[in-house]
Amino acid sequence: MDKSMIKKRGRPPITKDYPNPLQSPMAHSSMQVQKQGPHSFAKPLMKVGQSSPSPNKRRLSIDHHHNLAATTRKGRYRGVLLSTPTKKSSTNGSTPISTPSSNDSYNNTVFSETRKTFLQSSPPIMTSSPAFQKKNDYMFPSQEQFKLSLTITESGKAVIAGSLPFSPSSKSSHLMNNNNKKIMQNEKIHKGSKKNAPKFEKRRILSLLKQMKNEKYCDTDTLPEAPPAKPSRSDIIDTELPTIIETSASPIGSARNNNILLSQPPQSPPSSAQLKPPSTPKSSLQFRMGFTPNVALNSVSLSDTISKSTNAVGASNNNNQNGNSISNIADANTLLTLTNSPGVFLSPRNKMLPKSTTASNEQQQEFVFKFSSGDPLLLTDDADGNWPEMLFNVSNTPRRQKCFNTPPSWINFGSPGLFSPPRSSNVMVNGTTVATASDSGNVHRQLQAQLEAQVQVQSQSNSPTQRQQQQRQFQIPPPHINMNSSPPQINIASPPHQSMSRVSSIYFNKEKTTTGVANMLGNTKSENLQPPANLFTAAHGPSTPRNQEFQLPTLIECTPLIQQTMNGSLGTKYIPGTSISNSATPNLHGFPVGTGKAPSSFDDSLKQNPYSNKQDDARTALKRLIDDQ
């Protein structure tokens, strides 16, 4: 089959049987299109440019002055009047005209070079109105006016043709400055124009033009098409305008300034921000955004963020914990207030209130709601978030194995499997020794060891007098029970198969923890260190287990400020007359020595003397702990 007969899909046979491909019909048509392409595409552009009339048409309208209808018909289109005039129009404007009211003077005025810029600001149809033709005697009285592009209106005001539209503000200033002088000169010019005296009129107009040029009022003149006002009306306006401006400008301005000065204090951002309620009270987004709820603090979650100055105070208190523990204990309430409830420190209704323990405890109650949001990133505020130190404490803390099988509740945030590691995890003590925690009875020993290590750390770094003050601070709780200890009666199961030497070793190792844990224990009140809820049997009171401290993840437990916050924020007045030291202090008195007291003996001691000899119990436990070591 011939290759010339084979057709390719989608392409016509351009080189069909032609020896020269350029002779094919399609090649010929394509060459023609290429040749005609630039011209054909340039024609629409030329047509767009030729939409305005050509100079020949303008010459016809200027030369043949008798054809007024044609100029009127074409004058309706703005393009005719906006086009650039030719030189012939200016020469025709200088030719002598018999009468000023003739059609020649009218056409000469409309199509002169100086009138072109004036007509740009108004529709051309206005020039052909009968009212405009009736006023030709007044507006164009002589040839020299057209030559100088100056017209005089019926009110006797001199107007330069080709100026910008006349604004009221410029009119008022113009009338205020040259009121009497211009009226006198305009009346003389108007009388001279009626007498048809070109030479005298020329001198007057030249002098007036020079005066107006010096005063720079060329751009603020009225238009000829504007309806002329009567002289009496203009005089009234001239006399009223200065009084209006003088009497109203300064008092209004001063009154506005006074209003602004008086209205600035209530409109200041701090006052408006203080009265603004939280946009989303119980959502987890506002914890990150830093909204401060100032209303309904008892029902909404505590979502305030601490300012930079608050952070500096908290950091300085943390740094001073190693050197001086008395100042830390004295500032415990301040740290609690700054850490968990900055609304007490920052809100407007609490700025004047003293930072008392009762106010801090009331604010600490709302801190529980913050942990029920379910977002682990929202457990701590970004303001107190010293994240490298927190992560270091998480990785080096010896308390990571604490995870109790308590039923989930609204406060049980750290339920098993959520944040806590497995139970059989190894706990690094001092970075060298490893102590494997078992589930059978080790929980209560670890709690006791933490409390004793706390007391021992405080006692070893201070004098006996300071020790007494610290123990008073630790042992005197507020008259309400903590949420962690829901029942008043505590029955502790006896720990099986564990020797006293192992218990004492746990006590000793618990004391040698990292600096962050030591600081945390130094700031932690002993009222919050108790056995978990699954070791309790409640006789009355709330049945929901509330050991929030050890159910929380290790990020909260190992940060000093957050630990201080959690120890104070979970206190709720459920059962008056009971305290946490009822369960913790007698345990220190009897359990480490191995007296073998039954749980009922502890209950009896709690019932008989709940608040007596708290300092003696702490001292006795401390001495026995040191003797065992």
UniProtKB/Swiss-Prot annotation:
The modification Phosphoserine is found at S268. Interacts with transcription complexes SCB-binding factor (SBF) and MCB-binding factor (MBF) at their target promoters. Interacts with MBP1 and SWI6. One of its GO terms (biological process) is traversing start control point of mitotic cell cycle. Activator of G1-specific transcription factors, MBF and SBF. Promotes both the timing of G1-specific gene transcription and cell cycle initiation. Associates with SBF- and MBF-regulated target promoters and this binding is maximal during the G1 phase, prior to maximum budding. Affects cell cycle initiation by advancing the timing of transcription of G1-specific genes. Overexpression advances the timing of SBF-dependent transcription and budding. Depletion delays both indicators of cell cycle initiation. Residues 261-277, 455-475 have a biased composition (Low complexity). Residues 21-37, 245-260 have a biased composition (Polar residues). Keywords: Activator, Cell cycle, Phosphoprotein, Transcription, Transcription regulation. The keyword Transcription regulation applies. Phosphorylated by CDC28. It comes from Saccharomyces cerevisiae (strain ATCC 204508 / S288c). This is G1-specific transcription factors activator MSA1.
